[in-house]
Design a protein with these regions (language model features):
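A ligand-binding cleft/hinge motif common to bilobed small-molecule-binding domains
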Residues: 13, 43-74
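Periplasmic-binding protein-like
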Residues: 59-95, 116-136
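Short active-site oxyanion
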Residues: 1-2, 42-43, 96
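Ligand-binding clefts/hinges and TM-proximal coupling segments of bilobed small-molecule sensing domains
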Residues: 10-18, 23, 95-136
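Residue-level signal for nonpolar/aromatic packing positions in well-ordered secondary structure
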Residues: 37, 43-45, 80, 93, ...
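Short, charged, surface-exposed secondary-structure boundary motifs
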Residues: 14-15, 32-41, 77-79
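Bilobed "Venus flytrap"/periplasmic-binding protein-like clamshell domains
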Residues: 1-34, 49-53
């Protein structure tokens, strides 16, 4: 099968590991991915679940596609990188995140930003880990 995605992403590495033929895109919109999927140029788009969920919701009337809610792999988290010289900023950011989590602001931002999904809470999905350390 042909998997669509951006070069060198972990998603394309997973597709390659699973035996897909890679169709690599460079800086294109979701519209291009979806059009190629519908036209048969590709068979699947391998990408971040939440980003794809939003993309499909945005174009559902334009393209007959659907996200497979039953396939998950390789969970990830986001980090902030601070200069070691700026401990004060790190402390302020950590406090702000803690406060926003406590008062529900992070959940509201998440639901607004991720098509109604609360990404601040761990999912109940048992993610399989696919080792891609050997994939170029």
């Amino acid at each position: 099968k042909k998997a669509a995605g951006a070069a060198s992403t972990k998603y394309m590495k997973i597709a390659k590991k699973m035996g897909a033929e890679l169709v690599v895109y460079d800086n294109v919109t979701n519209d291009v991915y979806m059009q190629d999927l519908v036209n048969g140029r590709t068979d699947v788009i391998v990408n971040d679940y939440y980003l794809q969920k939003m993309a499909v919701a945005a174009i559902k009337d334009k393209y007959p596609v659907k996200i497979n809610d039953g396939i998950y792999s390789n969970p990830y988290s986001t980090s902030f990188t601070f200069s070691l010289k700026n401990k004060t900023l790190q402390e302020k950011v950590n406090k702000a995140i803690k406060d926003m989590k406590k008062d529900g602001t992070l959940t509201k931002i998440s639901e607004k930003s991720f098509a109604g999904q609360d990404v601040t809470k761990k999912t109940k999905v048992d993610y399989p880990e696919i080792d891609i350390s050997d994939v170029e």
